[in-house]
């Protein structure tokens, strides 16, 4: 029976050590060398790994293959934001976005081809859902960006899982990928530098809190159940009361806050009454709010709230004591802004119950 070849970059350090020692019969230090080549030196080929014996490299070659994505398109926005459309080994395509700032560079990575959810204002959700990404396909976005940007003296300092997909519907792969990103002997992103975003898949959200300890961002978008049922259909399964209760239980590390993402839709969710309901919803939850001017895409029935309306909404939240930021429309001219990513989904499949 044919055994699929591994991509070594998708193995946690523990899994890689087990493979090298138990399956290949090598010493543990060989696993450490291999890990360093993959996640510190960012090697792309076994031939580059000059301090590994030829015999060891032959063993690795027999059971593994690098599944590096190919660049289909690369766009750079007027504001410096960059977007890559990456082709995977099966021909599916995902989008990865780099957002440069003065003191940091944030990489927005995808976790699915398409999205399990079907939020009607989001271009990704409109594409349907094809499949989950593997751990290596998630990690490879970071390795690719680090190599590519380093050649231009740019750094990736922060990771946000806010690209295509609902990360928690692909939790096992996302967990392994995040553990690889966090590993101190490799890419070494601190837990404060990685943000996991979810629309509120509550059982997995609580599991992520226990197992990963990274920053949490929740795509809220409405503070009335009837409206959130429409904008975020997952709300029909896990409503606002359940979401609030789960967030209160979430094991936040000292000094950290939950980030709430709220897209501002003209005449839909942007009233002052909505802002006051938002304040009530956040009671006793250490929170930061990102208000996101809606980024339109062809055929969508929504419009963005005016900046005057957004500022009035912000003022109510701010006066209640919450840090509230109006997010810049980074990358809007290349469709790289929030809600605009679409990739190229082939053979979309039905979504799981409760996702739409």
Curated annotation (Swiss-Prot):
It comes from Magnetococcus marinus (strain ATCC BAA-1437 / JCM 17883 / MC-1). This is Dual-specificity RNA methyltransferase RlmN. InterPro entries: Aldolase_TIM, Methyltransferase_A, RlmN_N, RNA_MTrfase_RlmN, rRNA_lsu_MTrfase_RlmN/Cfr, rSAM. The gene is rlmN. It comes from the Bacteria. GO terms for biological process: rRNA base methylation; tRNA methylation. [4Fe-4S] cluster binds at residues 115, 119, 122. NCBIfam families: rRNA_mod_RlmN. It catalyses: adenosine(2503) in 23S rRNA + 2 reduced [2Fe-2S]-[ferredoxin] + 2 S-adenosyl-L-methionine = 2-methyladenosine(2503) in 23S rRNA + 5'-deoxyadenosine + L-methionine + 2 oxidized [2Fe-2S]-[ferredoxin] + S-adenosyl-L-homocysteine; adenosine(37) in tRNA + 2 reduced [2Fe-2S]-[ferredoxin] + 2 S-adenosyl-L-methionine = 2-methyladenosine(37) in tRNA + 5'-deoxyadenosine + L-methionine + 2 oxidized [2Fe-2S]-[ferredoxin] + S-adenosyl-L-homocysteine. PROSITE patterns: RADICAL_SAM (PS51918). Reaction proceeds by a ping-pong mechanism involving intermediate methylation of a conserved cysteine residue. Belongs to the radical SAM superfamily. RlmN family. Specifically methylates position 2 of adenine 2503 in 23S rRNA and position 2 of adenine 37 in tRNAs. m2A2503 modification seems to play a crucial role in the proofreading step occurring at the peptidyl transferase center and thus would serve to optimize ribosomal fidelity. Its EC number is 2.1.1.192. Residues 101-332 form the Radical SAM core domain. One of its GO terms (molecular function) is rRNA (adenine(2503)-C2-)-methyltransferase activity. Binds 1 [4Fe-4S] cluster. The cluster is coordinated with 3 cysteines and an exchangeable S-adenosyl-L-methionine.
């Amino acid at each position: 029976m044919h055994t699929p070849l591994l991509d070594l970059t998708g193995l946690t350090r523990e899994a890689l050590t087990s493979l090298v020692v138990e399956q290949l019969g090598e010493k543990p230090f060989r696993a450490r060398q291999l890990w360093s080549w993959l996640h510190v030196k960012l090697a792309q080929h076994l031939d580059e790994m000059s301090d590994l014996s030829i015999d060891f490299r032959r063993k690795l070659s027999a059971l593994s293959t690098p599944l590096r994505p190919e660049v289909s398109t690369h766009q750079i926005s007027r504001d410096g934001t960059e977007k890559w459309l990456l082709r995977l080994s099966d021909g599916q395509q995902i989008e990865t976005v780099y957002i440069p700032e003065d003191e940091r560079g944030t990489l927005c990575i995808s976790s699915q081809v398409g999205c399990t959810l079907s939020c009607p204002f989001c271009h990704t959700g409109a594409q349907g859902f094809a499949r989950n990404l593997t751990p290596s396909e998630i990690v490879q976005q970071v390795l690719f960006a680090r190599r590519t940007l380093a050649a231009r003296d740019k750094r990736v300092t922060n990771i946000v899982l806010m690209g295509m997909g609902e990360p928690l519907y692909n939790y096992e792969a996302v967990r392994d990928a995040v553990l690889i990103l966090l590993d101190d002997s490799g890419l070494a992103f601190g837990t404060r530098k990685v943000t996991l975003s979810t629309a509120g898949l509550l059982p997995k959200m609580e599991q992520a809190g226990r197992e990963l300890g990274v920053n949490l961002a929740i795509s809220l978008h409405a503070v009335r159940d009837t409206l959130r049922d429409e904008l975020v259909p997952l709300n029909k399964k896990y409503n606002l009361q359940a979401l609030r209760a789960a967030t209160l239980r979430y094991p936040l590390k000292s000094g950290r806050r939950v980030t709430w993402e709220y897209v501002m839709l003209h005449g839909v969710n942007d009233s002052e009454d909505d802002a006051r309901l938002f304040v009530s919803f956040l009671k006793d939850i250490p929170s930061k709010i990102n208000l996101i001017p809606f980024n339109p895409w062809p055929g969508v029935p929504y419009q963005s709230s005016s900046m005057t309306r957004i500022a009035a909404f912000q003022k109510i939240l701010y006066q209640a004591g919450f840090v509230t930021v109006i997010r810049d429309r980074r990358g809007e001219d290349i469709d790289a802004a929030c809600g605009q990513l679409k990739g190229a989904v082939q053979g979309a499949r039905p979504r799981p119950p409760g996702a739409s």
